[in-house]
Amino acid sequence: MSSLVSEIARRRTFAIISHPDAGKTTLTEKLLWFGGAIQVAGEVRARKADRHATSDWMELEKQRGISVTSSVMQFPYSRESADGKAQENIVNLLDTPGHEDFSEDTYRTLTAVDSAVMVIDSVNGVEAQTIKLLNVCRLRDTPILTFINKLDREGRSPIELLDEIEDVLQIQCAPMTWPIGMGKAFRGVYHLIDDKVQLFDPHGDKGTAAILDGLDNPELDRILGSQAEELRIEIELVRGASHTFDKAAFLNGKQTPVYFGSAINNFGVQSLLDALCELSPPPLARNTESRVVEPQEPKFTGFVFKIQANMDPRHRDRIAFVRVCSGRFERGMKLLHVSAGKTVAINNAITFMAQDRNTTEEAYAGDIIGVPNHGTIRLGDVFTEGEPLKFTGIPSFAPEFFRRARLNNPLKVKQLQKGLQQLAEEGATQMFRPLASNDLVLGAVGILQFDVVAHRLEHEYGVDAIFESHECATARWLKGTPAEIEKLIAKAGHNVALDGAGDHVYLAPSMVNLRLTQERFPELQFLETREIV
């Protein structure tokens, strides 16, 4: 039992959230490099990249230079803890799509982490997608560390950036490092907690030239010249005006420790990784419909937060990503697949290093394992050692965009249905079958998802589909007795469809129509999100 407790205590499972182009993929790569997980930190240059980021492995992502799916990477990281002892953590990094059109997959990934790193571009400050994602983290009070990136460019003043984060995101900022200049005059950072100056050298190993002790060190004046005195004055102001770090407020999602750096130059990344391991919580307890599951419980439990089809076109497979919530997983274990009511032996679970798959011998609470399946596992499914649990809080969102799928070759209708069913179960799109026709209607939270689906249908299923616009403003899941739902179908069946799970959905042609229908059928609930159970 003690080894179980100590293994779980050294896990850190987190995601990186940011607006597109804030430098998230670069930071991901550099964290993997500092963690020794990759040998070369390959730079990602949007569409021109010939060496692609480790975490962007799907063909379409390589073409577009954006992260379309969330991938999972695990690596060990050795460091010196605050009390000077050597410590090794196991870091599980979940990379999330930064593109605004992939918020649903990102949202679900955020249900599987215990903390998050928010990347802010020092030039652009807080942007739209950052606000959305932080609000998602807020629903579960996820602790957030902030990395203000691109200090090697002329950006906004650090004080202004902190004010904006506090004002727009409504979260206290506690600066842990402070930049010395910016752009061409960027010389490094001062560590407010341990009174050290870390000097920046873009050509140095890991971005650092030297580390000096103390603000009053005469060596500082020699190296920085007039910037040294400016720094002393600034730090005095910062200490007086900003919040000091409060661990309890951080763990409750009310305060964020802030680090400054330049990911592309490797600078500030190691401090962030050290802080992530030192400050972030180990695996946390999880709610189920019947009780709270503690990570140290000896029996295994886990839930599926993502399904990825065809991670390798050579294997026509699907991988269910399972967050381990308690206990220990061992290869060959027999687990209850709760929704199917069946016991299954898990012989070939895998861990991830983006594209590289390794067969898992064991995993602990906090880890992510991949379970290969042929269509029997769905989002939100739970695996246990026998207890019929249901974890809560993995939602599906009402789509905002709709398309009808049409085939160029009508003989491929079976492949189309199979492809769309698989992609819907994976969460890449939502599929609706209207009761009044044989149409297949797709719903998505962002337009780009249709491009992804069309590309994957063509390349993975050999189906050339055309997506036509579909008269629909929004979708609502129907909740009520079968008799009440039948009453609605009798009156407005042409607007009712079944989703991929076989649940009834109202596809409203306009918001006015939705409002009128709700008034006519007050006994029915029209739900905007549906928890996946």
UniProtKB/Swiss-Prot annotation:
Increases the formation of ribosomal termination complexes and stimulates activities of RF-1 and RF-2. It binds guanine nucleotides and has strong preference for UGA stop codons. It may interact directly with the ribosome. The stimulation of RF-1 and RF-2 is significantly reduced by GTP and GDP, but not by GMP. Residues 9-284 form the tr-type G domain. Belongs to the TRAFAC class translation factor GTPase superfamily. Classic translation factor GTPase family. PrfC subfamily. It comes from Cupriavidus taiwanensis (strain DSM 17343 / BCRC 17206 / CCUG 44338 / CIP 107171 / LMG 19424 / R1) (Ralstonia taiwanensis (strain LMG 19424)). GTP binds at residues 18-25, 95-99, 149-152. Pfam families: EF-G_D2, GTP_EFTU, RF3_C. HAMAP family: Rel_fac_3 (MF_00072). The keyword 4Fe-4S does not apply. Keywords: Cytoplasm, GTP-binding, Nucleotide-binding, Protein biosynthesis. This is Peptide chain release factor 3. One of its GO terms (molecular function) is GTPase activity. One of its GO terms (biological process) is regulation of translational termination. One of its GO terms (cellular component) is cytosol. Its main location: cytoplasm. It is found in: Cytoplasm.
